[in-house]
Design a protein with these regions (language model features):
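Short, conserved phosphate/pyrophosphate- and ester-handling motifs at nucleotide-, phospho-/glycolipid
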Residues: 178
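A contiguous, well-ordered beta/alpha segment that forms the leading edge of an enzyme domain
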Residues: 2-174, 184
């Protein structure tokens, strides 16, 4: 019985010591954070504005800008030199790792949703006026005519190249790219 009581006291002392270290560590971290400045970075990427506010010892604007630029150079339809824009212009190019990763994810989601999610919607997006062109409410005939070359099953990734069944098929990763860029 005495060993059991001694063991409990020892465990209580260890728990108290651990809790004390945890509290002191938390207080030190919080007090250090209070002394760190806030930074506010703004810019344009993916055809839209971004605002980032963060607390850090140094301004990370250049690093943030560089990472967002990588996403823009791969996935932005608003950047005429991006990988996706060049694919949409039917250039035979090797895609970068980022594009391949996002394309594979989009393909998976398209399959899981039975095509409700589809990265080949660029012609539809443009027809409705959400992309580069200002549109009006399109006719049923216009929509139906685009269906001939839209659909995730009409495009695939073979190694580092995108293969389209129809050269009029255009990709739009906007539904994934902005979130992906935020996560990067």
């Amino acid at each position: 019985m005495k060993n059991d009581t001694t063991g409990r006291r020892r465990l209580s002392k260890l728990s108290l010591a651990f809790l004390s270290v945890l509290i002191i560590g938390t207080v030190l971290i919080v007090s250090k954070q209070r002394n760190m400045p806030y930074h506010h970075n703004r810019g344009m990427v993916f055809g839209t504005m971004y605002n980032i506010i963060y607390q850090n010892e140094k301004d990370l604007h250049a690093e943030i800008e560089a990472e967002l630029k990588k996403v823009d150079n791969s996935l932005s339809t608003f950047n005429s030199n991006s990988v996706i824009s060049r694919i949409n212009s039917n250039e035979r190019i090797a895609v970068d790792e980022m594009f391949a990763e996002v394309f594979t994810l989009a393909e998976k989601i398209s399959g899981e949703t039975g095509g409700a999610f589809d990265i080949t919607v660029a012609p539809m997006v443009n027809l409705w006026g959400f992309g580069f062109k200002n549109g009006i409410t399109p006719s049923k005939h216009s929509i139906d005519s685009l269906r001939a070359f839209t659909g995730y099953e009409k495009v695939r990734l073979e190694g580092k190249r995108v293969v389209k069944k129809d050269s009029r098929t255009m990709l739009d990763c906007s539904a994934i790219a902005k979130g992906y860029g935020t996560d990067v």
